[in-house]
């Protein structure tokens, strides 16, 4: 059994929303409180291992959980959020207004979508699934703390619609998904 958890809140997750991607943004105060709440939620899960994206927002969330359950987070760079290239750090509203064709393509997502100057959703899904396959072989039950896009990519892998389903799921901060 693998549990996926999204990191706690960062300032980029609060209005006005910004594209985070692979930028290393820290948890804010709400995010630190959410991490403690997540730790309480998973305390009963009898976890054998704890994995995390190395980005500080995921790592800090995993460290709070790890302290509560007695596990040290194992970092895996394949779990990071998509490299969103030229869009990273930009406001969603600005992208929608200034790059309407690109924004519309992102809202459709799918196999062919690539962030300008960044990674494709297929590349993200392939690396996330490689990491999760290694976790599954090595150490279930495990908690994997990562990112909304990484969790969506894993859900797309399990869905017959593939990456066309990317925007089907809402993955709020500290969401917990059982694979």
What are these regions (language model features)?
Residues 2, 138-146:
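Generic beta-sheet signal
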Residues 5-72:
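Active-site-proximal alpha-helix that buttresses catalytic centers in soluble enzyme cores
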Residues 10, 150-151:
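Short active-site segment of divalent metal-dependent hydrolases/proteases
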Residues 25, 69-127:
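Phosphate-handling substructures
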Residues 43-46, 135-140:
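Glycine-rich phosphate-binding loop signature in dinucleotide/nucleotide-binding domains
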Residues 52-53, 126, 145-146:
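Short beta-strand scaffold positions
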Residues 161-179:
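Domain-level recognition of soluble alpha/beta enzyme cores
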């Amino acid at each position: 059994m693998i549990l996926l958890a999204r990191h706690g809140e960062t300032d980029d997750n609060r209005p006005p929303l910004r594209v985070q991607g692979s930028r290393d943004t820290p948890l804010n105060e709400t995010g630190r409180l959410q991490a403690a709440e997540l730790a309480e939620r998973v305390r009963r899960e009898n976890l054998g291992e704890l994995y995390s994206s190395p980005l500080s927002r995921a790592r800090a969330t995993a460290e709070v959980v790890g302290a509560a359950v007695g596990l040290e987070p194992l970092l895996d760079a394949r779990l990071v959020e998509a490299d969103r290239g030229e869009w990273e750090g930009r406001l969603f509203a600005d992208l929608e207004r200034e790059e309407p064709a690109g924004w519309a393509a992102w809202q459709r997502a799918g196999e062919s979508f690539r962030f300008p100057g960044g990674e494709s959703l297929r590349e993200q899904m392939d690396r996330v699934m490689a990491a999760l396959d290694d976790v599954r072989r090595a150490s279930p039950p495990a908690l994997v703390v990562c990112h909304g896009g990484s969790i969506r990519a894993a859900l797309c892998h399990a869905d017959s619609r593939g990456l066309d389903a990317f925007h089907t799921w809402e993955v709020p901060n500290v969401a917990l998904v059982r694979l």
